[in-house]
Amino acid sequence: MLNPKLKEQNMQRLAVYREGLKAMPQIHNLFFELTLRCNERCLHCGSSCGDVPSDEMTTEQWCGIIDQLKEDLGTEGSMLCITGGEPLLRTDFFEIMGHANELGFNWGMTSNGTLITEEVAQKLRDCGMKTISISLDGMQETHDAFRRTPGGWERGLQGVKNLVKVGGFQSIQVTTVVTHQNIVELDALFDVLKDIDIDSWRVINMDPIGRAKEHPELLLTKEDYKTLFEYIRNKRIAGEPVCYGCSHYLGMEYEREVRDWYFLCTAGLYTASIMVNGDITACLDIERRPEFIQGNVLNEHFKDVWENKFQIFRKDLSLENEKCRNCKEAKYCHGDAYHTWDFDNNCPQVCFKDVLFD
């Protein structure tokens, strides 16, 4: 384990930094939810995407928003993070993102990879995409069943290979959602990925949000979590580019061991999202309730909403719950991630205190 004293000092500094962000938030990651349509039907999808009605803004509306962001905020220091659904299902995708590129925005995307032919990969590079994360959730049979998409694994993997072949991107990442079912396939999937020149493998656990609430049997057990974090730590010790995602406070044992820095939920602090219909919120994984919608870009400037609202996201959740208030880790955890907080009962749905540490 890394030096515990140094870890604690760094976590204390991060807590001070978080307090500063609450007072003076700085937008770094702005998500564009271009569509809720998707050609896959993932059992864990936080947004319940698929063959669903998608009240999408038009090409002109998205381009107008990009113009407004350029005028109000500039392009330095922020990243447009494009997501869905599957963003590439929009026939105007390259028109919208080409416009963002022309104005000087840095942008990246999450995708299932199934639509990324070599030609599409070239177009993504040519219109300025910097980073991309492709989902591969286990080996072929498991992935296709989990995403309810026959052939999805093969097409997604080929999408990764096409991106690597074309090249010219800052980062090509594969993301794997780990479940009780596919955790046994991590080694096999690693063997597949190590022969492809990707930049990183991001491994995250399935959270009880969206459709995942209907499949509790897929959530990781206490033993699964320990297996997962030991697996990631050992890979990182061996110099492999594997990391755990940003969600959840992991305690002294695993913080900074399984990812590049310490836990900080940035929702509303330096992360915000523009939803498919123009609504403004913090993180797209947060439950879609009226009180979390801070405004709409069709009738308000994003900058005004960001600077004058978002108070619901700029507080310490650990103060809302007795268990958290009495926890010695609260000063670093702050109630954990907003997207797994139970706002009806004022308690975290995911807490690793009883799983990883006392």
Give the residues covered by each predicted segment:
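Residues immediately within or flanking Cys/His clusters that coordinate Zn2+
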Residues: F31, T35, N39, Y262, ...
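Conserved alpha-helical substructure of the radical SAM core
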Residues: L2-T131, L220-T221
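Radical SAM enzyme [4Fe-4S]-AdoMet core and its adjacent flexible, acidic
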Residues: L2-L6, S54, D126-T281, D285-V297
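Flexible mid-to-C-terminal extensions adjoining Fe-S/redox cofactors in radical SAM and related proteins
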Residues: L2-H28, S48, D279, D285-D358
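Structural motif corresponding to alpha-helix initiation and N-cap regions
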Residues: T59, R90, T117-E118, I183-L186, ...
